[in-house]
Design a protein with these regions (language model features):
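Flexible phosphate/Mg2+-sensing switch loops adjacent to catalytic phosphate-binding sites
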Residues: 197
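Membrane- and cytoskeleton-facing regulatory interfaces of eukaryotic small-GTPase pathways
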Residues: 1-170, 174-180, 184-188, 201, ...
């Protein structure tokens, strides 16, 4: 079905509309061979709190951004190549329901749909796009993924020393290897994590010792594949730290997601 939409006027019109909603702050999305597979609002677990984000699934990339004016204007556009993506379903945990992890080599985070049905639809469509993309390119799935970050609100004290309380002076920091919230002294070391950056990144003391030991022992296991539980509701990346600028805040009217490649909508 996706292949039938490649050269359709409806597909080009939809992609152009997405471009217009992001304005000059966004990148060009209308390129040969690209299809808009689906779109909708998901709740993204950001560093400080859960926030509504508009997501657009294309056959080769996943795009999301802040909602400034519902269905009319978005900003802070993020593009994720689907060939780098791996999904991991999350179990329901209290108020956090219908969620899954979106994991890549440079950034990993949790998102939540409004219903179980929408979760299944999103995951099925994303996985189908990933499978088709990898099959056509002949590439293998990425095996190394960035750690998801524990939200600031989940830690009132350092997760490493278990002593330091976070205040205006004692700031929170995140270990780039395991995602834990730690204090400054417990994250004073840096280590190269090639999948995330070409510069040494802040890591906690435990991860630093483990990574250094692996390097010394000649272990080829790649850094970044932490062993956090699948029910984690964390977010990685610093790009969300200043996301509170959005106009709509959390007052976003929910509409069911639209998927154009399943034949149910007008082509």
């Amino acid at each position: 079905m996706v292949d039938k939409l490649v050269n359709s006027e409806a597909n080009a019109r939809r992609i152009q509309m997405v471009e217009n909603c992001f304005g000059t702050s966004g990148q060009q999305l209308l390129v040969p061979g690209r299809v808009l597979v689906g779109e909708g609002v998901l709740t993204k677990m950001c560093r400080k709190r859960p926030k509504a984000r508009q997501f657009f699934l294309f056959n080769d990339i996943l795009v999301y951004g802040n909602i400034v004016i519902g269905k009319k204007k978005y900003n802070k556009q993020h593009l994720i190549p689907l060939e780098e993506v791996q999904l991991q379903a999350l179990e329901d945990n209290g108020q956090y329901r219908n969620g899954w992890l979106i994991r890549t080599a440079t950034k990993s985070f949790a998102v939540y749909a409004a219903t179980q049905t929408e979760k299944q639809e999103w995951m099925a469509h994303i996985n189908k796009c990933i499978e088709d993309l990898l099959r056509k390119s002949g590439k293998k799935p990425v095996e190394t993924h960035a750690a998801v970050w524990v939200p600031d609100s989940e830690a009132t004290i350092c997760m490493h020393c278990k002593k330091t309380q976070f205040t205006m002076i004692n700031r929170r920091h995140h270990c780039r290897n395991c995602g834990a919230v730690v204090c400054g002294p417990c994250s004073s070391k840096k280590f190269m994590l090639p999948g995330q950056s070409n510069k040494p990144l802040r890591v906690c003391l435990d991860c630093y010792d483990n990574l250094k030991s692996m390097k010394r022992d000649g272990n080829k296991a790649l850094a970044g594949n932490n062993n956090k539980p699948a029910n984690s509701t964390e977010s990685s990346g610093e790009d969300d730290s200043g996301d509170d600028e959005e106009t709509l805040k959390d007052n976003v009217t929910h509409d069911e997601p639209k998927f154009y490649a399943d034949g149910k909508l007008e082509k």
